[in-house]
Swiss-Prot record:
Membrane-related topology note: Multi-pass membrane protein
The species this protein was found in: Desulfitobacterium hafniense (strain Y51)
Cellular component aspect of the GO annotation: plasma membrane
Name of the protein in its database record: UPF0060 membrane protein DSY4157
Keywords for this protein: Cell membrane, Membrane, Transmembrane, Transmembrane helix
Stored SUPFAM superfamilies: Multidrug resistance efflux transporter EmrE
Length: 108
């Protein structure tokens, strides 16, 4: 369970961080190498989920989506300085509950 959480967090940071660098390059006129570095990081984002032990691609990516939402809220708060409101936190918590059910519900 700890390894799964670490891999989800690493994937999220790679996706958000890489995407953010591409955003800065294209939307905020940063140097082209922001985009290059962002693209390289996004390749790692594509690789990291394959290290998960769960057998189903769909389940891994669906569960990762919930983790991504939480990380995106935290990124917006920490990096973009946009304070999440109560509904952001409630929505993120609901997603985390969904991830937990999807990955660790007892199955036969």
């Amino acid at each position: 369970m700890v390894q799964a959480a670490i891999l989800f967090i690493l994937a999220g940071l790679a996706e958000i961080g890489g995407g953010y660098l591409v955003w800065l390059w294209l939307r905020e006129a940063r140097p082209y190498w922001y985009g290059v570095i962002g693209a390289i990081i996004l390749v790692f984002y594509g690789i990291i989920p394959t290290l998960q032990k769960f057998p189903s691609f769909g389940r891994v990516y669906a569960a990762y989506g919930g983790v991504f939402i939480i990380l995106a809220v935290l990124w917006g708060w920490g990096v973009d300085k946009k304070m999440p409101d109560t509904y952001d936190w409630i929505g993120a918590a609901i997603c985390l509950v969904g991830v937990t059910v999807m990955l660790w519900a007892p199955r036969q």
